[in-house]
């Protein structure tokens, strides 16, 4: 079904050795374009939701059966062996929406319970292969899928887990290093747990007008990004960068400065101006956010460089748990050039300089292991495992 294959390792310490301290250019007056939107710009969810028709689902089902008949491994799913002749053009256009227009879309209509977990995952990978040709690693052990859930089987106290493995609210952030963030909704929450998106450009424009010193602080490459709990290593990078005419964000409040779990460390704490700038852009993101009412079976794809995301706290049902499956994707043709100061986590996800196993866990493992570092983090960890130690890897063959 979803067996291992190979790709490059996460040699992030080598990737992080030569980063200039200050890459800030002159402040612009404003960032304009289709990515500079406000949640109020969207009258309803039909504006950004692609509702599949019956014939569309039939085409996807036929592609699934065609792929399974080939006897290939799940990791081999791509646009060549998952044929969608009628949907391909619109999926290609949706990839352009992510990179060149509003930056996101929701695909709806695959919520039927007729799919097994394996088939549902294969469909997710197959459709995603039309959006982007590369799937990134999400931890140092090579996991390509991560499960964002709070399993009822886990006994480890919630304060000792990653934030994505809890029911708590997560602040606005990016998944550092990811180009396109994709989420498959396996099951929604009983109450709450909404996903929110917010335009980095719109939030930044507010700072340019009202707090230019905060905008300058975010563009300055002196933010300490912790990359390991063992030895407490970090590199310096900007929270925002203007590169090739695009505003790009690499913000995770839980990775800036020393993490509480690290103990005594030489990693610098955030300065007062950095703390203020982080608070200001977060508040601006809240003011202009868009709430997504995602349904079971939905697929969400968005530009992780251009949009911040967060979620509400939530309550699960007695017998159900909110469950999303995450992919990190890159489109080799449309993907944005990444500034050198933001390369370390990107290189960790997409780099090719050695041999590494790629794993596709289908469900979370019942026995949750306490992470070595960054319990409570909203996004991934670069060196210590975010998913590999707490998810079971199902290695099987497609029937």
What are these language model-derived features?
Residues 118-125, 198-199:
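"Short basic amphipathic alpha-helical interaction patches in structured regions
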């Amino acid at each position: 079904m979803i067996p291992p294959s190979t790709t490059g390792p996460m040699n992030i310490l080598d990737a992080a050795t030569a980063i200039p301290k200050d890459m800030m250019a002159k402040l612009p007056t404003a960032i304009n374009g289709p990515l500079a939107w406000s949640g109020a710009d969207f009258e309803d969810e039909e504006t950004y939701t692609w509702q599949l028709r019956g014939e569309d689902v039939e085409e996807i089902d036929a592609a699934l059966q065609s792929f399974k008949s080939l006897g290939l491994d799940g990791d081999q799913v791509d646009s060549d062996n998952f044929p969608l002749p009628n949907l391909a053009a619109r999926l290609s256009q949706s990839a352009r929406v992510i990179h060149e227009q509003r930056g996101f879309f929701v695909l709806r209509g695959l919520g039927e319970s007729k799919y097994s977990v394996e088939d549902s995952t294969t469909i997710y990978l197959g459709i995603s292969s039309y959006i982007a040709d590369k799937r990134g690693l999400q931890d140092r052990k090579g996991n390509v899928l991560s499960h964002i859930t709070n399993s009822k089987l886990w006994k480890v106290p919630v304060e000792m887990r990653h934030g994505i493995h809890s029911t708590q609210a997560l602040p606005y952030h990016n998944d550092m290093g990811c180009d396109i963030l994709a989420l498959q909704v396996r099951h929604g929450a009983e109450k709450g747990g909404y996903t929110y998106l917010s335009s980095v450009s719109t939030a930044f424009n507010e700072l340019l007008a009202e707090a230019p010193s905060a905008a300058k602080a975010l563009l300055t490459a002196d933010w300490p990004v912790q990359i390991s709990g063992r030895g407490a290593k970090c590199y310096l990078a900007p929270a925002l960068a203007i590169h090739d005419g695009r505003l790009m964000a690499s913000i995770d409040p839980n990775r800036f400065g020393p993490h509480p779990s690290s103990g005594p460390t030489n990693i610098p704490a955030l300065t007062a101006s950095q703390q203020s700038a982080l608070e200001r852009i977060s508040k601006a993101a809240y003011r202009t956010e868009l709430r997504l009412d995602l349904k079971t079976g939905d697929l969400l794809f968005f530009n992780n460089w251009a949009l911040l995301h967060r979620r509400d706290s939530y309550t699960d049902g007695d017998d159900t748990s909110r469950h999303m499956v995450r992919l990190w994707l890159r489109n080799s043709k449309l993907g944005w050039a990444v500034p050198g100061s933001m390369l370390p986590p990107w290189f960790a996800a997409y780099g090719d300089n050695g041999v590494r196993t790629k794993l596709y866990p289908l469900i979370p493992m019942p026995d949750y292991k306490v992470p070595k570092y960054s319990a409570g983090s909203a996004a991934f960890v670069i060196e210590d495992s975010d998913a590999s130690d707490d998810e079971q890897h199902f290695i099987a063959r497609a029937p």
